[in-house]
Amino acid sequence: MMNRLLVFLMLGAAFMLVVSAIDQDANDVNMVKRFVSASCLCASDGPTTRGNSLSGTIWLFGCPSGWGDCKGRAIAGTCCKRE
């Protein structure tokens, strides 16, 4: 009986953790959650990374306002550059 109670309490705590992590305003995505903090190679940088700077930044859910898609290479997300 005690084991069932502990399992129930742990599942309840995990559920509350997930529910409390959801944003109240789903349309307002926080910049920290969108930004990966990794550089990427924009199309204007050239074909290879050798001798070229990585001028793009990877954003997970599209480019925010003030940034444009630089048609670069990113494994996940979008390669964006400040406009």
Swiss-Prot record:
Where does the secretion signal sit in this chain? 1-21
User: Which is one GO molecular function term here?
Assistant: toxin activity
Cystine bridges: C40-C79, C42-C70, C63-C80
Localization, UniProt: Secreted; Nematocyst
Pro-sequence positions in this chain?
A: 22-32
Descriptive protein name:
U-actitoxin-Avd1g
The protein's job, in short, is: Binds specifically to voltage-gated sodium channels (Nav), thereby delaying their inactivation during signal transduction. Thus it strongly stimulates mammalian cardiac muscle contraction.
Q: Which domain of life is it from?
A: Eukaryota
Q: Which family does it belong to?
A: Belongs to the sea anemone sodium channel inhibitory toxin family. Type I subfamily.
